[in-house]
Amino acid sequence: MTTEVDEVNDGAAPATGTTAASLLVHGVPRSRRQAVTAFLATWASQIGITLAFVAVWLTFIILAPDTFLDSRIYVSFAQTTPYFAIVALTLTMVIVSGDIDLSFPSIMGLSMVGFIGVERGLNGSVELAVLAALAVGAAAGLFNGVFVTVVGIPALVVTIGTQFLFRGLTLVLVNGRSYALVEARDTVAYRLLVGRFLGIPMQFVWCVLIAAGTWLLLYRHRLGQNAHVVGDNRHAAELMGIPIRRTRIILFVLTGMAAALAGVMNSLQVANFYPSIGAGYLLPALAAVFVGGTSVFGGRGTVWGTFLGAFLIGGIDAGIIAVGLTDYYTELIYGAIILVAISIHAVLQRRFER
């Protein structure tokens, strides 16, 4: 039996039909029909999130023009939304591979423990502290990946556990204390991570760069091709000799590093580290991924959708308050968005597969 993998297009999983089973379905060869199905499903989700983004933004502009026609609010979005958008982008790859990581908010805090330890122990070397934070994030992601792939426990269960484990470890290591980082504002690391470039917040610049890198990894690199096949059909991936365990572990490591970077940026921006950092980013990041068109079932995802989804979710909080509602509605709307997005993708997937 031979298996062929088509080139992965933006958001479309590779076709994994076997030549022996390339039967005609409604007059179309099976492999070609799968490719057409993936193409339609992908572009439907990307066009959908783009139209939703424009519609919601126009609604906010009409209902609250004083707020949403002021350039300052967009500078604010460019500073704050990347904190969860960066993680959502790498989380997209994890979900495409058929896994999920719910521990990233706690990894943000744990990585900052490494930052504080190096920064306080090496005469204020913020640049080395950033590298230490990234190393801790990578180690936390490696722990998740190994636990999931070697022990064989579902990622959902493992990362719920490590979310509490990493948060508890953070609290124990810093004894529940916060740390001021005011002196870090005069460093190169501060200017590179949360400064300004031509008036644009560096958080947004990094978010765009990471989005571009994620796109290249997911659609133009073997890692992304493997992730698509693993998420779409793990048995087929085994038959094709794809390194399933290594692929999944690498994606968890990348998400851990993204969480660490987001934690460092957040702490530098507010010039303070607090152990509960990242606690409010779980729902926004998940909502960005799913509303952006990534399938909860794995095998299909879109970086463009996640990027737009993150800024759509980031604008909802401000929009709710600007139109006169209280912030009590925020989590209600986040939860509703996740459920609706997952339901729509499930219905579309069943419809396209018929």
Q: Which residues are covered by each model-predicted region?
A:
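Cytosolic-side transmembrane-helix boundaries in multi-pass membrane proteins
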Residues: 2-54, 58, 232, 239-246, ...
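Short loop segments and helix-boundary regions at transmembrane helix junctions
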Residues: 35-41, 95-100, 121, 138-181, ...
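Hydrophobic alpha-helical transmembrane segments
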Residues: 46-51, 77, 84-85, 106-110, ...
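Hydrophobic core segments of alpha-helical transmembrane domains in multi-pass membrane transport
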Residues: 49-61, 91, 163, 167-168, ...
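Helix-loop-helix "hairpin" substructures at the membrane interface of multi-pass membrane proteins
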Residues: 124-133, 138-144, 148, 196-273
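Transmembrane helix-bundle core of multi-pass membrane transporters
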Residues: 155-221, 247-250, 269-278, 353-354
